[in-house]
């Protein structure tokens, strides 16, 4: 199997990206190293790279001859479908062969179907033929024929201008609701008298947030209030709604005091 290493990404002190550490790690990697990058709506932190940072990543990957594997499970949950795909286009325009793993489970509310796609950008027709041959072998020995129901649903929507327009509108509503929940959580924590600045939650994107809560505080949320979060402090913002936001904010305020 592959030897798997980690590279620096999240900076807890600034609630942002440790970009200096990330670049240093990329520059230390041997050529042909596969590097997994989140194209948008970073999971679990919710902290994304800026366009300028992506440009530096693309240049570094090209110079070091690395192999980017772009994980794009939440396209459309950041700004919009077009903007959220900008990192993929940067690699393609730079002539870099890369792999793109897309998921439609969340954006189409087909979580139980596990619908996705693997797209591979190659440098030539000859490389395409070789990659396709290897993919067929891997697929044949792993699952041979995938379930078709979820994929058929997604294809029907994307190939119909009317259905696609409706889907994009509804996806935008989902995105706006999540952003609203972020805003409400921040404002309600402030109203509860919490002096810690949680404004960073509003700058994060996608379904998740690194809240800054400790594992002990997360345990208290679970044991005392029946609110579940990951031990790292990651919370699912998409699980918040108008009926539970007050309860959650009040509980977080209590474990912080």
Give each language-model segment a name.
Residues 24, 52-59, 86-90, 184, ...:
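Alpha-helical scaffolding segments of alpha/beta enzyme cores, especially the outer helices
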Residues 23, 126, 187-191, 213-257:
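PLP-dependent enzyme catalytic core of the Aspartate aminotransferase-like
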Residues 1-2:
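Substrate-binding/gating loop at the entrance of the active-site cleft, primarily
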Residues 132-151, 157-186:
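Structural signature of PLP-dependent enzymes
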Residues 9-77:
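Active-site phosphate-binding strand-loop segment of PLP-dependent enzymes
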Residues 166-224:
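Conserved PLP-binding catalytic core of the aspartate aminotransferase-like
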Residues 84-130, 134:
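Active-site PLP attachment segment
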């Amino acid at each position: 199997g592959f030897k798997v290493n980690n590279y620096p990404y999240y900076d807890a002190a600034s609630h942002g990206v440790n970009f200096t550490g990330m670049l240093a790690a990329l520059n230390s990697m041997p050529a042909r190293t596969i590097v997994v990058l989140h194209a948008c709506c970073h999971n679990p932190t919710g902290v994304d790279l800026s366009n300028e940072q992506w440009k530096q990543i693309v240049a570094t990957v090209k110079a070091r001859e690395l192999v980017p594997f772009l994980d794009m499970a939440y396209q459309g949950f950041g700004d919009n479908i077009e903007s959220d795909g900008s990192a993929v286009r940067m690699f393609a325009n730079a002539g870099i062969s890369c792999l793109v793993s897309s998921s439609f489970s969340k954006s189409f509310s087909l979580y139980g179907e596990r619908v996705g796609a693997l797209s591979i950008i190659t440098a030539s027709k000859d490389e395409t033929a070789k990659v396709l041959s290897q993919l067929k072998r891997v697929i044949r020995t792993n699952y041979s024929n995938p379930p078709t129901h979820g994929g058929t649903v997604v294809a029907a929507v994307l190939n119909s201008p009317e259905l696609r327009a409706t889907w994009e509108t509804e996806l935008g509503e989902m995105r706006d609701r999540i952003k609203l929940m972020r805003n409400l959580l921040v404002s309600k924590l402030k109203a509860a008298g919490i002096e810690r600045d949680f404004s960073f939650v509003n700058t994060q994107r996608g379904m998740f947030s690194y809240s800054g809560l400790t594992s002990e505080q997360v345990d208290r949320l679970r044991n005392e209030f029946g609110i579940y979060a990951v031990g790292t402090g990651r919370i699912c913002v998409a699980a918040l709604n108008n009926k539970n936001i007050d309860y959650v904010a009040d509980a977080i305020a209590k474990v912080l005091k």
